């Protein structure tokens, strides 16, 4: 039911807003407050949600004109016949809402502020759950409801994904706040997801699923580790860190593992997801795939820059800091185990998603074929 989907889509904003506004922090430079970040997050997502509501009502109205029945039922709306121009406009309404939440450049600017000011739990929630609902929305609603418009829009969407990969990587280089660096790395990783979704390949679509799960695990772990650093150092500014490898037990080594996983370390879920996305996308878009592959190099650079700035180099102090306690260790090691299991045994996840992703691929693949024959 599209109305229920929209209702709960908007309900997600409320707890996240209060998580940032009430329990968040100021930015490391002190210029941006948690209220600023929470308000920016709310405005971006609320405005895009209203655009999607207009698109939903437009689709319902077209269906009513054809059948005389007002319904928000997904199965009924799938049967609605749409004129090409109408389909494209309605698809854009859905795409904009999901692009803000994913996020897609240039609709991403709320994410670094939200991550930087959110408490650790809020950042984990954002990276692990909220961003993934946007990809789910594209796969479940935008592509099946508007396959022809999605096929026509695919080159633009894949180009936006490509821009996101490099834009997120370049801005990650420039960050001094460790949470903002991880946030921009998320923008870069979601570029691969967008390319996979619009590739029209079942292999790439299954890679999208693996990549979303793996990114949720690795990004959540990196935010947890940055929160643990903040508890000990009372700063997220990497210029105030340095030399921590010899001053804190366990945290540097575990951070190195998750940073390597984030850049696609073989044996982790991130490698499987990115590999399937690039392999599946190559047949339909070889140039975009080739350029996106080079973006992985930049991913490795900003990940290693983060590790070098925080844990190596000259030490700011000789004080030995408290190591990880049992609770902190269990949290991150649990995520590490899940990430390795996903990387070594992805087949159960691929088998589970095969039928669903085949259906999505059929909708988009048929539309691609019709578009090619029309040209």
Predicted region positions:
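Acidic, glycine-rich loop-and-beta core segments that form the ion-binding/anion-interacting portion
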Residues: 112-114, 118, 130, 134-216
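Central hydrophobic cores of alpha-helical transmembrane segments in multi-pass inner-membrane proteins
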Residues: 13-22, 93, 97-100, 104, ...
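Predominantly late transmembrane helices and immediately cytosolic-facing juxtamembrane segments
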Residues: 105, 219-222, 288-322
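Juxtamembrane/interfacial segments at transmembrane-helix boundaries in multi-pass membrane proteins
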Residues: 25-28, 33-40, 50-108, 142-156, ...
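Hydrophobic alpha-helical transmembrane segments of multi-pass membrane proteins
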Residues: 43, 92-99, 126, 156-160, ...
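Residue-level recognition of pore/gate-forming positions within transmembrane alpha-helices
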Residues: 13-14, 49-50, 128-132, 162, ...
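Alpha-helical multi-pass transmembrane bundles of energy-transducing inner-membrane proteins
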Residues: 2-82, 86, 171-184, 188-237
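Membrane-interface alpha-helices at helix entry/exit sites of multi-pass transporters
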Residues: 37-40, 118-128, 236-253, 289-295
